[in-house]
Amino acid sequence: MRSNSVNIETFKDMLKRYEDFKMKNKREPRVIFIRSGGGESIPLETFRDMVRRYNNFKDRYGREPRIVYVTPPEPPVPEVNENTPEYVSITQFKDMLSRYNRFKEVNGREPRVVFIYSGGGPSVSLETFKDMCKRYNQFLEENRREPRIVYVTPPEPPVPEEVREMRRVLGEFKTATQLYTLVSRRCKYKFYYNDQTPNREALKKMVTDGINCTDACQLFKPVIEGLGYSVRIEHVKVRCNDNKWYGHYFLRVAGKELASVSLPSERWTVWDYVSATKTGRPLGAPCCSRGIQHLGWGIVSPKHD
């Protein structure tokens, strides 16, 4: 069959033809055609199973299904089973690769799972095995030698200290957007000129006395970079509600859910500590909305890098 399912209208037509045949011939048909007039058909046993699953669905959900599978779909294969090791030796990996290739050659298709050891036992899904092969080939290309081991699933990268320390103060976050939300709820702004506070001290002051835009940029840049984003500090002038221009610093961030890294830096997403803590503006908006002038990148004569 070209498809493993039929829509509900086709199934009910099959059911009607099955009942008509039984009534007319006093027996069940050996096969049931998918469509009236001939063509593709299924055995009686398969059709009975379709009827059973159709009735089960109606009893359970109080409505008809939109489709009925000819044969029930196979359950999803877990990525790894509970006994699967964290990694395999290069010898073991190459044995898995050999068995995978042999299966393809013999059966004309890929296996649903690849066993870690010949003869059964722990296994990985086809998708996981393909990822193992991709990482093996990348290592080979980059290092011009085979790895000693291949991880079944890649290990989590170590969390940078700056991210760990920020999570200790603000709580859990995984993205720059989530971090911005936490900053808007927990942190404070304090006006003063230039950068005056080392990062370790600023980490404490941001939730007590408050810090300014310069110290905030120096504090949050390595944190957001540690989450996997590209970050630059932009030096600007902003015009506020009093129509005066003020010097200001904020972050431009790209990657993941924010602006694309392929865009020029001046089009990356604005991540402004003062917007979050003082003026209550959303992520992507600078603290003042009456005007903005770009002055440069990075902090002028920083005291605390």
Curated annotation (Swiss-Prot):
Pfam families xrefs: Peptidase_C71 (PF12386), PMBR (PF09373)
Thermal activity characteristics from the UniProt entry: Optimum temperature is 71 degrees Celsius.
Assembly information from the UniProt record: Monomer.
Region (Pseudomurein-binding repeat): 3-34, 39-70, 87-116, 121-152
Organismal lineage: Viruses, Duplodnaviria, Heunggongvirae, Uroviricota, Caudoviricetes
Organism: Methanobacterium phage psiM2 (PsiM2)
Active site: 213, 248, 272
GO molecular function: peptidase activity
Miscellaneous comment as given in the Swiss-Prot or TrEMBL entry: PsiM2 is a defective prophage of methanothermobacter marbuggensis.
Note on domains (UniProt): The N-terminus contains a cell wall binding domain. The endoisopeptidase domain is at the C-terminus.
Keywords assigned by UniProt, alphabetized: Antimicrobial, Bacteriolytic enzyme, Cytolysis, Host cell lysis by virus, Hydrolase, Protease, Viral release from host cell
The protein's role, per its UniProt record: Cysteine protease that cleaves the cell wall of its host methanogen under hydrogen limitation of the latter (autolysis). Cleaves the epsilon-Ala-Lys isopeptide bond in the oligopeptides of pseudomurein.
Enzyme class of the recorded protein, top EC level: hydrolase
Protein name: Pseudomurein endoisopeptidase
Activity dependence on pH, as recorded: Optimum pH is 6.4.
Co-factor binding details: Activated by Ca(2+).
Cofactor: Ca(2+)
Assigned protein family: Belongs to the Psimunavirus Pseudomurein endoisopeptidase family.
